[in-house]
C-alpha cells in the first residue's frame, strides 16, 4: 500500500472509531430480519472489511452483538485482506461452533466483493438493494439471489435449504 494511501486509511479508521460509527444508522427492518433468523434458530455471523474490533464496537453500539455468533474482520496483522479471506475466517469460526457445511450458509452483502467472497467458498450469495453498491455493480457478477429490502431478504433466507 502506498504511504499516502496507508495514511488516509489510518485517518479514516481513527475517525470512524472515535465518532463515525456513532453517526451510523441501522437499515430500517434489519432488526426484524435478525429477530426472525434467531426465532428460526439460524446462526448468524459477520464477515466485514472493517477491522474486527471496530465491527464489534459497532454491533455493541446498536445492541446487536449478542445476535452474531462470529465476527470476522478485514484486518489481520495490519495488512488489508480480501473478502474471500474474511469469509474464510468467518467459516473457520463457524466450524468451531459446529457449522461446517458452506452449502447450508448464505453470504449477504451490498457489494460485489461480498458476492466474490462467498462464491470463493461455495456459499450461496445474496446481494441486497441497499448500502453502498452502485446501480450496475451486480451486472457482471450474478449473485445467486437478490433482495430489494429486509422483508424480502428474510423471506428469501427462510426459503433456502
Label each PLM-derived region with a short phrase.
Residues 6, 35-38, 52, 56-161:
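Asp-based, Mg2+/Mn2+-dependent phosphohydrolase catalytic module
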Residues 18-46, 52-56:
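Short, acidic loop-to-helix structural element flanking the phosphoryl-transfer center
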Residues 1-2, 29, 149-152:
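Acidic/polar helix N-cap motif
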Residues 4-13:
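Acidic catalytic patch
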Residues 15-18, 72:
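Short amphipathic alpha-helical segments at helix-loop
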Amino acid at each position: 500500500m502506498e504511504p499516502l494511501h496507508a495514511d488516509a486509511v489510518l485517518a479514516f479508521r481513527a475517525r470512524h472509531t472515535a465518532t463515525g460509527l456513532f453517526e451510523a444508522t441501522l437499515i430500517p427492518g434489519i432488526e426484524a430480519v435478525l429477530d426472525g433468523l434467531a426465532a428460526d434458530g439460524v446462526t448468524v455471523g459477520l464477515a466485514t472489511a472493517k477491522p474486527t474490533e471496530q465491527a464489534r464496537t459497532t454491533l455493541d453500539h446498536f445492541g446487536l452483538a449478542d445476535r452474531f455468533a462470529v465476527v470476522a474482520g478485514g484486518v489481520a496483522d495490519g495488512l488489508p485482506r480480501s473478502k474471500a479471506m474474511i469469509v474464510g475466517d468467518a467459516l473457520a469460526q463457524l466450524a468451531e461452533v459446529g457449522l461446517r457445511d458452506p452449502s447450508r450458509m448464505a453470504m449477504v452483502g451490498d457489494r460485489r466483493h461480498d458476492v466474490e467472497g462467498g462464491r470463493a467458498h461455495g456459499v450461496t450469495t445474496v446481494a441486497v438493494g441497499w448500502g453502498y453498491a452502485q446501480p450496475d455493480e451486480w451486472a457482471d457478477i450474478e449473485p445467486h439471489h437478490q433482495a430489494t429490502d429486509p422483508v424480502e431478504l428474510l423471506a428469501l433466507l427462510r426459503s433456502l435449504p
